[in-house]
């Protein structure tokens, strides 16, 4: 039995299938961890969700910002933007089945025997792993609650509040928790977010660092696998931090990581989100 983690799919199904074939992935015995952003911008968002649903018993999945955006558009189609490639999912005959599965996924996964956490964007430096799991569970509970789901999805958009406080309540509390787990790149040591800068490390605003680069980060004893930040190209010079979004949908690559052996497989991609000829290699990003 092998366990793999894969970077942001964003509706790019063929590179995923190429990687799984190369790794001899067997859904009957192996496990696949997904760092979120399963859909959007790529050519096969609906097919990707259907494929994942078909092997759902082999998956561990955390939600990304694009997945939450899809759930919001499911409840209010006016949320769709020109650049979104999500309408076919909303209009699909099996949409309700797919959405019900999607909303039951996690924001943060922790594999205690391995000492490894997986999250889409990151864990802010001021939270312990225990605190992060506790707050992730608050949002996960709302996602699975028919009575509160729509209110949360309507209110989750926005950059404020930009810092956690235990005194936050209601949708503002849920929004900042969501932003940490699904949108964060740069923050201060006390967790104040900058959600505008989206490029590489050199684009850090004054007084801000990548969330994983704060020396007193309270989750530093835990190995963390994350996606979201394609501009990093998978390069993070911090022990125990594994970045897997290597920009497949932008003409970069899709990266598969063996959680136990540390081996990487990479599939180089076209800007259309399809594999390049002779695209597979075993180089670390």
Curated annotation (Swiss-Prot):
Q: Which InterPro entries match?
A: ApaH, Calcineurin-like_PHP_ApaH, Metallo-depent_PP-like
Do you know which Gene3D superfamilies this protein is assigned to? 3.60.21.10
The question of whether Hydrolase is a record keyword is answered with: yes
Protein EC: 3.6.1.41
Enzyme class, top EC level, equals hydrolase
Q: Which reaction does it catalyse?
A: P(1),P(4)-bis(5'-adenosyl) tetraphosphate + H2O = 2 ADP + 2 H(+)
Any idea which GO molecular function terms this record carries?
bis(5'-nucleosyl)-tetraphosphatase (symmetrical) activity
Cite the entry's keywords alphabetically.
Hydrolase
Q: Which HAMAP family match?
A: ApaH
State the similarity comment.
Belongs to the Ap4A hydrolase family.
Q: What does this protein do?
A: Hydrolyzes diadenosine 5',5'''-P1,P4-tetraphosphate to yield ADP.
What protein am I looking at?
Bis(5'-nucleosyl)-tetraphosphatase, symmetrical
Taxonomy of origin reads: Bacteria, Pseudomonadati, Pseudomonadota, Gammaproteobacteria, Pseudomonadales
């Amino acid at each position: 039995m092998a366990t793999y983690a894969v970077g942001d799919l964003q509706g790019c199904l063929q590179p995923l299938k190429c990687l799984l074939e190369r790794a001899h992935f067997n859904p009957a015995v192996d496990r696949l961890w997904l760092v979120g952003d399963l859909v959007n911008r790529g050519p096969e968002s609906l097919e990707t969700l259907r494929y994942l649903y078909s092997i759902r018993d082999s998956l561990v999945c955390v939600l990304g910002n694009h997945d939450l955006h899809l759930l919001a558009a499911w409840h209010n189609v006016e949320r769709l933007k020109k650049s979104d490639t999500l309408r076919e999912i909303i209009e699909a005959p099996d949409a309700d089945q797919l959405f019900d599965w999607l909303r039951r996924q996690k924001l943060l996964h922790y594999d205690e025997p391995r000492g490894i956490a997986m999250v889409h964007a990151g864990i802010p430096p001021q939270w312990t792993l225990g605190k992060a799991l506790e707050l992730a569970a608050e949002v996960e509970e709302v996602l699975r609650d028919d009575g509160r789901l729509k209110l949360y999805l309507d209110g989750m958009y926005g950059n404020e509040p930009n810092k956690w406080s235990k005194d936050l309540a209601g949708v503002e509390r849920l929004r900042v928790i969501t932003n940490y787990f699904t949108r964060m790149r740069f923050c201060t040591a006390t967790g104040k977010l900058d959600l505008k800068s989206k490029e590489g490390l050199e684009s850090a605003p004054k007084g801000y660092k990548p969330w994983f680069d704060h020396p007193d980060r309270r989750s530093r004893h835990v190995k963390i696998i994350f996606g979201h930040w394609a501009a990093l190209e998978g390069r993070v010079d911090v022990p125990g931090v594994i970045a897997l979004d290597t920009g497949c949908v932008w003409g970069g690559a899709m990266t598969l990581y063996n959680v136990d052996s540390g081996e990487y497989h990479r599939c180089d991609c076209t800007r259309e989100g399809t594999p390049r000829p002779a695209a597979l290699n075993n180089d670390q990003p």
